[in-house]
Amino acid sequence: MANVVVVGTQWGDEGKGKIVDWLSERADIVVRYQGGHNAGHTLVIDGVSYKLSLLPSGLVRGKLSIIGNGVVVDPHHFVAELKKLCDQGVKITPEILRIAENAPLILSLHRDLDAIRESGLSGLKIGTTKRGIGPAYEDKVGRRAIRVMDLAEKDTLMAKIERLLRHHNALRRGMGVAEIDSQALYDELMQVADKILPFMDCTWRLLDEGYREGKHILFEGAQGALLDNDFGTYPYVTSSNTVAGQACTGSGMGPGVIHYVLGIAKAYTTRVGEGPFPTEQINDIGEFLGTRGHEFGVVTGRKRRCGWFDAVLVRQMVAICGVQGIALTKLDVLDGLDEIKICIGYELDGRKIDYLPSSMGAQARVKPIYETLEGWKAKTAHTLRWEDLPVQAVKYIRYIEELINTKVALLSTSPEREDTILITDPFAN
């Protein structure tokens, strides 16, 4: 028995969807433990693309899939995404999909607040998806959130709504926005209550039972560790913890049940939205990586910023997340380049450093120190065996391993799940 956490080690979009899908075939249970529907991923199965942003990837494989308490759930999006998958022929029932009863809900007022803030009326622009994720987490921490279980308790729901609106209507008055009527919000929730409640469960008990029965549990992270609210490029981060440790608090399982942490990293670096990006290439290389790698957001369609592989950042996240192996993705995007650069350190105010400081000012001032490697002309795309990789590609991978202090466990050579070279099976530990 082994339970595996999958975590992105960059700013998200590392290719977690494909890797989770590949691993879910070996898993019995797949659980989402943080985030909301702000981070999407695409699964390609038998030539069919499935785009997910809230539902666990295991659903497409018919595995028991759980949305944990660490996830904020937009009930309207939940219903829409469920319908879209069902329309594609995926059979989804309450027997294979469960939602934590204590998961907070994203409401229309959260989306309103997110959009107003991001429009620039309130100062710093973070680059959010405007889907209400941050405001929903604020209400969770502020102990005023409406949770899934509240939909089943209609006799107390109105009182909880009124308490929530005392806070939000005060904000809306200050921003010059019309207040929300409590009955209107109650009616909004009642429209979806019957569609979401059949999936509600005490999910920590389900997971505990599965663990005691010796089932393989796969913890599916969203976004990337560099967007973590504590350890990311603050304030240009998300509103939840995205590091591997969140798998425990976001699911209701203790750290002793985790046996392997698999980090996901692209063979180069991308970022969506605002914030520091030391190795960003605003030039032909950046355009090449973006075009070859199809670097556009699944959820927003926004063009991703692109740059060279930053070993400093990945090594930092490997340490913070306790990563035991890396799944390296999109190696094939680098095919054909004459030379490839890797960031091996930074220069900050005239001195060399080997980590990214927490200070917003320092993060903006660091300059990357590069080492240049010879590229390769032969294709790595669709390669299925390690020994068939170009020599220079192998050297590139080995150097990355040396720099980030962990080994490559899986190598992805195309979006197709079959194009995966297994070096170390995370579930074998």
UniProtKB/Swiss-Prot annotation:
Residues that coordinate or bind Mg(2+): 13, 40
Positions with a binding annotation for substrate: 298-304
MF annotations from Gene Ontology: adenylosuccinate synthase activity; GTP binding; magnesium ion binding
Pfam families: Adenylsucc_synt
Required cofactor names: Mg(2+)
Cofactor: binding details: Binds 1 Mg(2+) ion per subunit.
Location in the cell: Cytoplasm
BP terms from Gene Ontology: 'de novo' AMP biosynthetic process; IMP metabolic process
Domain of life: Bacteria
Ubl conjugation is among the record's keywords: no
Primary location recorded for the protein, binned into one broad class: cytoplasm
UniProt KW keywords: Cytoplasm, GTP-binding, Ligase, Magnesium, Metal-binding, Nucleotide-binding, Purine biosynthesis
Active site, UniProt feature: 13 (proton acceptor), 41 (proton donor)
Gene Ontology cellular-component terms listed: cytoplasm
Biological role stated in the UniProt entry: Plays an important role in the de novo pathway of purine nucleotide biosynthesis. Catalyzes the first committed step in the biosynthesis of AMP from IMP.
Quaternary context: Homodimer.
Family note: Belongs to the adenylosuccinate synthetase family.
Name the UniProt record assigns to this protein: Adenylosuccinate synthetase
Organism of origin: Bartonella tribocorum (strain CIP 105476 / IBS 506)
Organismal lineage: Bacteria, Pseudomonadati, Pseudomonadota, Alphaproteobacteria, Hyphomicrobiales
